[in-house]
Amino acid sequence: MTGVYQMNNAAVVIETVRVLEQKGYRIDETALRKGLSEVYWPGRFERLHEQPTFLVDGSHNPDGIRALLESLRSYFPDRKIRFLLGILSTKDVSTMLRLIEPLAEEIGVIMPPSEKAMDNERMAQQISRECAVRTTAFASIEEGVRSMIENAEKEDVICATGSLYSIEEIRTCANREFHQNCGGCERL
């Protein structure tokens, strides 16, 4: 389980097992340990590539963004993050931006594939008004992923987040881009 917040999820699993055991269920401790060590949650602090590091995380509300930022600070201390961000218009965009701003080197804006998606140009304008961060609106998820990767240095951290709707397309575009550019170099 990657991401600092996953420790809380593991604690819930362990407590659930404890309660089940009190009710007479027998849970093998080795199986529990194996399960916790092998659990994988796609789209949650999922690392797609190294050098540059490319992460995808489906955080789509202020609490999710707080948890994501805690993990980013833990795994990448003293580093600025290049965010690729697409958020639904029904979300608390201002709070999410305020949380992201201190850690952001740049924000690339995309539109999640949803009727509720916030227009990328409108969101870029909002970011420019509310944050002192370099911002670019991209016409598509593919263009955003390509640009972030092409303009990244090896030591950069790119984090695509803001909507669960975007995860699969971001993953597909990133994997294709890394494969085309370097034959899968440092790909996870």
Question: What is the predicted role of each segment?
Answer:
Residues 166-168:
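Short, active-site-adjacent cap segments at secondary-structure transitions
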Residues 163:
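Active-site-proximal loop/hinge segments that shape catalytic or ion-binding/gating pockets
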Residues 113-116, 179-188:
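Short, flexible loop segments at boundaries between secondary-structure elements
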Residues 53-54, 62, 97-157:
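C-terminal helical cap/extension that packs against the catalytic core
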Residues 1-106:
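Nucleotide phosphate-binding/pyrophosphate-handling subdomain across enzymes
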Residues 20-21, 72, 127, 152, ...:
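Active-site catalytic pocket residues across diverse enzymes, especially alpha/beta-hydrolases
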